[in-house]
């Protein structure tokens, strides 16, 4: 049975709604307030009954949906092969599925034959990559997430204004590689508070910071605080760079972790935002694991566990969540309760290369409302 829970902070109440379908479940749906549910219990459940708390929002963000759609539409419109630089999104299931349809994933532009069509991944690319593509006559389709593009634009703006840039993020991530390439001569990357102390800049009064879009909110906050301590006049982005979906999924885990004995995050190991969800859970004292699918679940993890919270990183498809929940059902977790922490209705338009090819109307890029 599936119950549905919305987290509210005021006017706690329980509202019963008619039987309906929620995602891939059908059953009685109950809307209630999470804070009114004691740990290990829920509507029509007992402290000893095994249950799953299915977090919402979870899974695909608007940028990931857009990137995957771009590859699929390109294959349907232009036919295979379509080359894609790096993984279109950081999820092996998604990449393998697109490869079966005819997408060819390459590490660098140099691996694409001259004159062929290539798609840039959602994580963005540096100007140097764009220049190489142009020099080799490649037909480029840009699937960079608009929120990543926003960070690139900010980097260029600050660099032109004479600022030294501090880019907060993980050096080995594709997104950082692309953003760093916008102003490599004036940009330094920091991954933790300790690295802030070692920063040296020509003018401490002309420093600006930017962040990777998939960081932990807590991690970014601590580093930004350290930067402001070191550079009191430091400038920052007009609005925070961390993606709305990254934030929403972390907030969901933060709200539910104390009600769970175990948190399972569906996502690939190279997914930054998925790894951050595990960190959020563990930092709150609840055991958390990152899993690609149900086959990665160690049965020992479930010993003595009555409540399992399940979520998914922004690049993990819902079919993998279904797989995990089905596994848990088969292992006695028959009570599945969907916990909706906040609504999420962000959409991004397709790039002009795709819009023109399919002859559809253009669409302005949507932005999340905070």
Locate the predicted segments by residue.
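Intrinsic disorder/low-complexity segments enriched in polar/small residues
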Residues: 20-21, 45
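Short hydrophobic alpha-helical segments enriched in small aliphatic residues
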Residues: 12-17, 26
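Secreted/extracellular small peptides and ectodomain modules produced from precursors
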Residues: 22-23, 59
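Low-complexity, intrinsically disordered Ser/Thr/Pro- and acidic-rich segments
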Residues: 5-9
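The feature marks the mature, well-folded catalytic cores of soluble enzymes
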Residues: 29-312, 318-370
């Amino acid at each position: 049975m599936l119950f549905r829970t919305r987290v509210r902070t005021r006017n706690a109440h329980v509202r019963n709604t008619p039987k309906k379908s929620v995602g891939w479940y059908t059953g009685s749906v109950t809307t209630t307030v999470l804070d009114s549910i004691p740990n290990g219990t829920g509507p029509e459940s007992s402290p000893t009954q095994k249950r799953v708390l299915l977090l919402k929002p979870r899974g695909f963000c608007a940028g990931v949906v857009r990137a995957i759609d771009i590859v699929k539409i390109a294959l349907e419109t232009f036919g295979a092969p379509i080359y894609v630089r790096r993984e279109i999104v950081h999820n092996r299931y998604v990449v393998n599925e697109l490869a079966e349809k005819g997408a060819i994933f390459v590490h660098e532009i140099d691996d694409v034959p001259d004159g062929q069509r290539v798609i840039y991944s959602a994580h963005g690319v540096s100007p140097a990559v764009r220049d190489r593509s142009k020099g080799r006559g490649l037909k480029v389709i840009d699937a960079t997430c608009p929120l990543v593009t926003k960070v690139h634009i900010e980097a260029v703006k600050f660099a032109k204004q004479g600022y030294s840039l501090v880019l907060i993020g993980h050096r080995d991530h594709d997104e950082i590689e692309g953003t760093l390439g916008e102003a490599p001569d004036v940009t330094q990357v920091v991954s933790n508070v300790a690295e802030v102390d070692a920063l040296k800049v020509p003018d401490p009064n002309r420093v600006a910071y930017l962040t990777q879009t998939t960081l932990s909110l807590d991690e970014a906050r601590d580093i930004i605080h350290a930067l402001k301590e070191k550079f009191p006049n430091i400038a920052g982005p007009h609005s925070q760079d961390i993606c709305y979906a990254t934030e929403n999924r972390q907030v969901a885990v933060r709200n539910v972790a104390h009600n769970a004995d175990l948190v399972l995050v569906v996502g690939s190991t190279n997914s930054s935002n998925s790894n951050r969800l595990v960190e959020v859970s563990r930092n709150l004292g609840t055991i958390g694991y990152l899993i690609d699918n149900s086959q990665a679940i160690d049965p020992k993890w479930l010993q003595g566990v009555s409540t399992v919270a399940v979520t998914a990183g922004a690049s993990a498809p819902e079919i993998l969540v279904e797989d995990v929940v089905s596994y848990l059902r088969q292992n006695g977790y028959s009570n599945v309760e969907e916990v909706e922490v906040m609504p999420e209705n962000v959409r991004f338009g397709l790039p002009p290369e795709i819009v023109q090819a399919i002859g559809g109307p253009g669409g302005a890029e949507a932005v999340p409302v905070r």
